[in-house]
């Protein structure tokens, strides 16, 4: 940042008692924003540009910038407390899952028999130079790295093999034994198969799909101790970061991002993929202010793409794993019932509620507390009075706890040959499922769906929140909790891990390596 020395000295005052230096940082930051934007906008105009909701819930007299920071991202099964805009943790398969060998669509043998030749792919850890840490998950960190040959920037997601291969703890095993499993006994091999399947899920899904609102995968490889995914670097940071800094968002902004998220979810569902972990932490903003979904570690892909596989109960039409982030999980997931891709639309309702109100509809110390709140609240979550009727309507339609009454967005997405016939307007029965078209809802009246689904809207327009980016390598829109971390310990060739699981199946990670085509790489660089 460039400031005049006289201006800096003018803002400095000395406290004779404590010998402390006081600086008006808020003014410095505000002036820097104006400097980067090249305009002389007022402070009020800059706040409006960030799309802060005019009716935001007051935060005990504190400005949005002073909201409670997220807790440490160290792995935790359930958060102890979930105040507004505090980072939520996902429930992984080892935390709570219904293990059943008949429900697996990928086995270790399938992984080993992958037709990708490891030796044909030349990328390795030494091809990339670490710049800074962007985030941290249950299995490892996400680093911003630079290609030493081309200087291109990537987001490198690291997954520790030991976390995947080591057997579950006694507590986890006991918890699983208490789950109903249709008469089948759980064992470590089943749990390992499930963890391996989910490890390969993100690599497999991202290597097969391409959508403007979904992060891109360029390379993947592994060494003795870790798996690496080289992903598209999205410099605008997490939606969580912007919510934390600026409070709630206005309805126009929420409607725009709701359209982009739903467009990505609809695309995934047509490809037989259920996302299962929609939350602000997994939504990134690119340089133009458009939203991009990331982190597909908990996603599930049908064995037969979008086709229904009746022999595999855990396909897109019948999933069983208790997985995701409790505050955004559909009730049927938390209750351990069978569920389908419709669970993603409930999560969308939770995310919209969070953006508008400042917290998810239901919070609690664990998933049992949350499900109790959902069951006790027969009328659904309380919708704030200040929201428009259109926004109240879509929230009520998406947040139905009964799947039969929830809006089946995939079925009623847009006009097709089957539903293109005009229908007589009938009064909807109380509690009946919504049958109107999703894309024609009132809150989307300003959205050009053809441009959005084709990707042209993302290329030709700016989103409601355009991140301030002065240097891509600074990662200015990522939390300093992460960017201040050291990457030295995580960016070295580790010694081979020595656990029994490795000796039993030394090639179970074979086939993980991947390299995108040259034309694909040129398209995005």
Curated annotation (Swiss-Prot):
The keyword Membrane does not apply. Its EC number is 2.7.11.1. The active site is at 277 (proton acceptor). It is an enzyme of class 2 (transferase). Residues 445-524 form the AGC-kinase C-terminal domain. Residues 170-193 are annotated as: Disordered. Residues 128-424 form the Protein kinase domain. It is found in: Cytoplasm. Pfam families: Pkinase, Pkinase_C. Belongs to the protein kinase superfamily. AGC Ser/Thr protein kinase family. S6 kinase subfamily. Present with 1470 molecules/cell in log phase SD medium. AGC kinase which plays a role in TOR complex 1 (TORC1) signaling pathway which mediates temporal control of cell growth in response to nutrients. Required for phosphorylation of ribosomal protein S6 (RPS6A/RPS6B) at 'Ser-232' and 'Ser-233'. PANTHER family: RIBOSOMAL PROTEIN S6 KINASE (PTHR24351). This is Serine/threonine-protein kinase YPK3.
